Swiss-Prot record:
GO terms for biological process: electron transport chain. The keyword Kinase does not apply. The keyword Transport applies. Keywords: 4Fe-4S, Cell inner membrane, Cell membrane, Electron transport, Iron, Iron-sulfur, Membrane, Metal-binding, Repeat, Translocase, Transport. Signal peptide: none annotated. This is Ion-translocating oxidoreductase complex subunit C.
Amino acid sequence: MLKLFSAFRKDRIWDFDGGIHPPEMKTQSSQTPLRQISLPEQFIIPLKQHLGPEGEICVSVGDKVLRGQPLTRGKGRTLPVHAPTSGTVNAIRQHTTAHPSGLSELSIIIVPDGEDRWCERLTYRDYRAQSVDTLLAHLHQAGIAGLGGAGFPTAAKLQGGMRGIETLIINGAECEPYITADDRLMQECADEIIQGVEILSFLLQPKRILIGIEDNKPEAISALRLALGKRSDMQLRVIPTKYPSGGAKQLTKILTGKEVPFGKHSAAIGVLMQNVGTAYAIKRAVIDGEPLTERVVTLTGEALRQPGNVWARLGTPVRHLLKQGGFHVTKQPMVVMGGPLMGFTLPLLDVPIVKISNCLLAPSHSEMEPVAEEQSCIRCSKCADACPAGLLPQQLYWFSRGQEHEKARDHHLFDCIECGACAYVCPSNIPLVQYYRQEKAEIRAIDEDAQRAALAKVRFDAKQARLEREKAARELRHKQAAAGVSTSDKDAVQAALERVRRKQTAEAEIGSPITVIPDAQPDNSAAIAARAAHKALVREERVREKQSQQETPATEVTPEELDPRKAAVAAALARVKARKAAQQSELNTTESVSSAIPDTAAEPIAVVEAQEQEDPRKAAVAAAIARVKARKAAQQLVTNVEAAVPVVTETTAEPIAVVEVQEPEDPRKAAVAAAIARVKARKAAQASSYQEE
């Protein structure tokens, strides 16, 4: 009984809720065999042609490349891209790519040389002798991605399905009304597709393999049945035509009866799905050693004179492909990449073909309905009835328009497959899929900002923790250093401080430096007085020479007369008499001398006058000489000259006797003595002036 029940369920087909039946236009392109096209003038290869980050560029401008040579490198979800032909790297710059936003992406521009030479290829004809990791790495380096639409890296997808996969589904449904790329590939390359499925079976070791195909492809069904022969490990399942039966979750439900939970992938229920085009690319990569450099693209639409399916090199500009189909750009402005339900209008015709590009639709004016104005939602619920994912399109529409991101997320916005069934049946002509795409992009941007903020916070917290650790380590080192200081170290520190204090004291004793005042006029009064005194001395010497012939020589000065006090008194008396004589004298020389020399007290340099003081001129000369010598001695003491200047006065005249006094040993004591002498001299001069008066 159980065996009979298993046989009854063996070929059973389930159905999914929702879906639509749009008019089919597949016959425009499905009846024409696959054909090769000429090489374009340049190839535009975007770095990102898959679901994941772009790879690292490994070529430079001006490099010569061969077909199949990697242009980028990457790991994990970062797939490399390869040169579609041999030629020269002409530029690496931003270029508009095949995306609904029309944004630019970094691309490599290659100018072909026309030789189309391959690089060295690595083949694994006996792939069963290789390890699974080796084959997965080879598929990754070949740049194999899902060709059914999403472009997920195949090696990463297979790596995630190594455990728990019971059913491998090969998707050949191709439910879009105009697209026939997989249909034509199954008709002409069924054997190679089956070889690719065998490689997948070797990698995954599933319990069963199901090949799903819609019943509107009779030629492809016949070709696959012929290629399968009498195989028992693979089963071909022909399903009813219904849009979108080619969706991953929908085909899983049709073939297995299992529903994929919200927010999950089919691997969560033990199912893994691959497209027939991906299976073909896997065979070419493993057995033939060819990286993914071309794919089948459908050229269809009534605006094309030669519709069909072509082998298009990745990076071929759309304009070049349309010319191969007989398309006139000046007559038809609109071109759709993809099908009429899930495709998008191209902003430019210079965008390149990428790994997920399966169709170029150039409709005529009769094929396109006039653009209808968007109306308000009437809550008819037709969109909910047509949704194959079991969502509430009306609620998602309101949440998207109201920027209610969390509510849209809670209502499973990201489970929407963007099939366009809701917009197709909407009587208000609301472009629901556009709202959903925009809302998804905004939520992804918010999530990325939140991730960056969280990462920045983690980095900030790590930095603060590191700074705290470094601070604690420094404090610990300082404490350990302070605790480990020995007595000898302290003595050395004290000795260094004592040397610094002694040096500062010595600098203070030397005195402050002489201050130089800019633009100041020098005081030459002392020099003028000295010259005048010298002239007076010369004249007096001449007079004394004449008098010395008549008078007796002067006696030597006794030691008692060398007393500084007596000398100071004598000098003061001489100055008083000199003033009086100067007032009465009419000689200009004596007046200039007495006015130029300031009244300063004499230093303790003893100049003893031993002659008679009746002559006023001699007294004035003697007083001038005493003042000059006193000024010189004072200047020498102020400038701290080490060697004192000895004062020697030669007198040949008998009335004046000059005695040289020894210089004091200590300059400070000499200065003090000089000051005392000046004070006493002033007092004595005042007393003598009072007596004379």
